[in-house]
A protein has these predicted regions:
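Alpha-helix boundary/capping residues
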Residues: 1-5, 10-13, 74, 86-89, ...
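Bulky hydrophobic/aromatic packing residues
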Residues: 24, 55-63, 92, 129-131, ...
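A near-ubiquitous, low-amplitude feature marking generic local secondary-structure context
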Residues: 30, 65, 90, 94, ...
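N-terminal leader/propeptide and maturation segments of large enzyme subunits in energy/redox metabolism
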Residues: 61-83
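Alpha/beta-hydrolase fold catalytic core
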Residues: 76-107, 112-117, 123-129
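Mobile gating loops/cap/lid regions near enzyme active sites that modulate substrate access
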Residues: 106-213
């Protein structure tokens, strides 16, 4: 299933409101939907990304009925494709993978591609670092914030590997604020059809994102 197909299905259940982005008249002179339709996304240097397990914390006891309802909006062919892609995961992991793609990853890829069409410099990342004993959370929504701002509170189990990833992320954010490029000496390629991104997980490295789901 393509990124666009997944987003279109999610959009059929979308209701404007809480999750709408602010229209700041600089990066977003209008709603993303309107800008994409008329190819009016402004040219900007943009760094954007998602976390690997955005929604896992919301799915601690997923049932087969829950999963069936989640798949109901897709065609039979699409349901088969999704099941094949996620066959090695348990129900909680399946629900997280699908909803993370619907809510975060696929919209972010579409936004990156729209910016790319407008000749913007686009840099993509995936945050995948997991703290010790975090199997029920993993790389959850918002987990990257203590790394970016180096605010690892005492109650958070923090290893030397976490500190290294934090240093890497701080450096990237500072570089981007200074120059519009988060990398150093070309070590972070711009986003393209190759789907290359920075993977923030010790040891952080450049890698290809899987766009199938």
């Amino acid at each position: 299933m393509s990124t666009l197909e997944l987003v279109e299905k999610a959009d059929s259940f979308y209701k404007p409101g809480y999750n709408d982005p602010p229209i700041d008249r600089w990066l977003l002179p209008g709603s993303p939907r309107e800008l994409h339709v008329r190819k009016g996304v402004p040219r900007r240097s943009v760094m954007l990304g998602t976390n690997e397990h955005e929604n896992l914390m919301n799915y601690a006891s997923t049932t087969k009925s829950d999963w069936t309802r989640q798949l109901a909006k897709y065609s039979e062919q699409q349901r088969t494709q999704i099941e094949q892609l996620l066959e090695d995961k348990n129900l909680n992991e399946k629900m997280d993978a699908l909803t993370t793609a619907e809510d975060f990853f696929c919209p972010t890829v579409l936004q990156a591609n729209a910016l790319l069409e407008g000749n913007s410099d686009v840099f993509m990342y995936r945050f995948a670092q997991e703290r010790p004993n975090s199997k029920s959370l993993r790389a959850y929504h918002g987990a990257e914030l203590p790394y970016v701002f180096d605010t690892h509170d005492e109650w958070l189990p923090t290893t030397s590997e976490d500190r290294t990833v934090s240093k890497e992320m701080k450096t990237a954010w500072i570089n981007f604020a200074r120059s519009g490029n988060p990398g150093e000496d070309g070590d972070w390629p711009e986003w393209s059809a190759d789907a290359i991104a920075m993977i923030f997980r010790y040891p952080s490295m450049i890698g290809e994102l899987d766009l199938k789901l």
